Amino acid sequence: MPFSVEVEVFFLLVEDKLGWLPTLQPVRHGSKAVTRHRRVMHFQRQKLMAITEYIPPRPAVSPRCLPPPPKPPKEESGLIRLLRRDIAAVFRDNRMIAVCQNVALSAEDKLLLRHQLRKHKIFIKVFPSQVLKPFLEDSKYQNLLPLFVGHNLLLVSEEPKVKEMVRILKSVPFLPLLGGCIDDTILSRQGFVEYAKLPSLDRLQGELVGGLTHLTAQTRYLLQHQPVQLTSLLDQYVRQQHEGDCATSTEGKPHPPDPAPDS
């Protein structure tokens, strides 16, 4: 292979200055290496290669990656069925249902609160959430579900004793009222407070009866006023006619002669 003389002289000079170096160093001359480009495959061969392409089989799925087999439905215990019946009876027989947060009350405070509410026939009911929530999901009270977070208790009564309940709960500030429903109408905490400001039912009934009585009396007066006035006018007309006839008959008769004076 030919070598360049200039390169050989260069290496000799470097050897004198730096020490021992190889005296000969091959240097390649000539054209560059030819880079072969990949030839485009004929379209028929492309089809054949695509058809005959090897498709490896899918690896077998480990049994641990498969979903577990469905478990048989769990049968409800007798306690769950009993609690479900109690919950259905509470929501069916009571018109007022209030939801409160079940905070950690002492036994004495809880007994005092229960006694104060029982005076007004308001009762405290506590049910587990895993039984109460499925009942609400399948009933018309499903909009109450957002109130049941954590531990809750229910204040129920057959009549809406909202004023008494709000007054008692104000004395227990650490027992928050979340909301509830009255006569199947959902109310918030502010709704209960506004409902408590309404007058009592007896007072409203008295005002209604008084208003109806006043309207009845006014209607009776209006119905009798015209006939009475017409009757009085007719009586006055008859009396005037009678007085006119009497005056006419008196003017038509001759005056009796004056009696002769005694001689």
From Swiss-Prot:
Cellular component GO terms, alphabetical: mitochondrial large ribosomal subunit; mitochondrion; nucleoplasm; ribonucleoprotein complex
A molecular function GO annotation: structural constituent of ribosome
Predominant location category: mitochondrion
Keywords, sorted A to Z: Mitochondrion, Ribonucleoprotein, Ribosomal protein, Transit peptide
Gene Ontology BP, a term: translation
Subcellular location: Mitochondrion
Residue range covered by the transit peptide: 1-29
Residues covered by region (Disordered): 241-263
InterPro entries listed in its UniProt record: Ribosomal_uL10-like_sf (IPR043141), Ribosomal_uL10_bac_type (IPR047865)
Taxonomy, superkingdom: Eukaryota
CDD domains: Ribosomal_L10
Subunit structure: Component of the mitochondrial ribosome large subunit (39S) which comprises a 16S rRNA and about 50 distinct proteins.
Family label: Belongs to the universal ribosomal protein uL10 family.
UniProt-recorded name of the protein: Large ribosomal subunit protein uL10m
Native source species: Rattus norvegicus
